[in-house]
A protein has these predicted regions:
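Structural micro-motif
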Residues: 119, 130, 134-143, 147-155
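Thiol-/selenol-based redox modules, centered on thioredoxin-like
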Residues: 143-190
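Short loop/turn microsegments at loop-to-beta-strand junctions
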Residues: 30-31, 52-53, 151-153
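Short active-site neighborhood of thiol/selenol oxidoreductases, capturing the structured segment around
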Residues: 46-69, 73
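Short loop/turn motifs at secondary-structure junctions and domain boundaries
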Residues: 23-27, 47, 145-148
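Structural microenvironment flanking redox-active thiols in thiol-disulfide oxidoreductases
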Residues: 70-132
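N-terminal targeting signals for export/organelle localization
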Residues: 1-32, 36, 184-190
Length: 190
C-alpha cells in the first residue's frame, strides 16, 4: 500500500494540472453558464471540459425542426464506430427555459428514448441562453405565439470547448461532419 501512495498522488496531480490549465481564449467554456439537466443535476459549462461534445440548441415544444435536430444528432452519433462513439458526449440546450423546466426535459428525453448516459438535455437562464447561442453562432428569436425562429446546426467542440466543426445539414447524415468527429477523436490529447 505504501508503494501505491506515490502513484495515487502523481495521478491526482496530473488530473488537477489538467483542470488548472487555462482555457483557450476561443473556448465556449469561458462562458459562465450554469446548466441544469433533465435529471436536475447542475454543472457549469466548463465542467464539460475534457471530452469532445456534440452540441446543439432546441426547445421541446418545437414540432418541426427540433425533432429533426435531435434525430440528426442521433444519426451522426450512430454513424461513428463504437470506440469513437464512446468518446463523444451529446449536449442539447434549450432556447426556451421558461417552458423547458427539468420535468419537461425529462419527459422529452423519455418520449424520444434519449439515454441519459449519452444525452444531456439542459436548460439555463435566459441571459445565458443568449450568451451561449451567440458564442456558438446560433441565432434565435421568440415569435409572438411563443414559438422560436432559430438556426438549426450541430456543433462539434473539442475537449477544451473550441468549435472544431459544424453542420447545418439536418434530417440526413453529413459525411464530412462525421469525418471531422473521427479525426478529432483520433488526435492525441496532451
Amino acid at each position: 500500500m505504501k508503494r501505491l501512495l506515490p502513484l495515487f498522488a502523481m495521478l491526482l496531480l496530473l488530473g488537477s494540472a489538467r483542470a488548472a490549465t487555462p482555457l483557450p481564449g476561443d473556448s465556449v467554456y469561458n462562458l459562465p453558464v450554469q446548466l441544469t439537466d433533465q435529471d436536475g443535476r447542475q454543472q457549469t459549462l466548463a465542467e464539460r471540459r475534457g471530452r469532445p461534445q456534440l452540441v446543439t440548441m432546441f426547445y421541446t415544444s418545437c414540432q418541426m425542426v427540433c425533432p429533426m435536430i435531435i434525430d440528426s444528432l442521433r444519426l451522426t452519433r450512430n454513424a461513428l464506430d463504437p470506440a469513437t462513439r464512446a468518446q463523444i458526449d451529446l449536449l442539447a440546450v434549450s432556447f426556451d427555459p421558461a417552458r423547458d423546466d427539468v420535468a419537461t426535459l425529462k419527459s422529452y428525453a423519455q418520449k424520444r428514448k434519449l439515454d441519459p448516459r449519452i444525452w444531456t438535455l439542459a436548460r439555463t437562464e435566459p441571459a445565458q441562453v443568449r450568451q451561449l447561442s451567440g458564442v456558438l453562432g446560433l441565432q434565435y428569436r421568440q415569435l409572438p405565439d411563443g414559438e422560436f425562429n432559430h438556426s438549426s446546426e450541430l456543433i462539434l467542440l473539442d475537449a477544451d470547448g473550441r468549435i472544431a466543426a459544424r453542420t447545418a445539414r439536418i434530417g440526413k447524415l453529413d459525411p464530412e461532419f462525421v469525418e471531422a468527429i473521427r479525426k478529432l477523436v483520433a488526435q492525441p490529447r496532451g
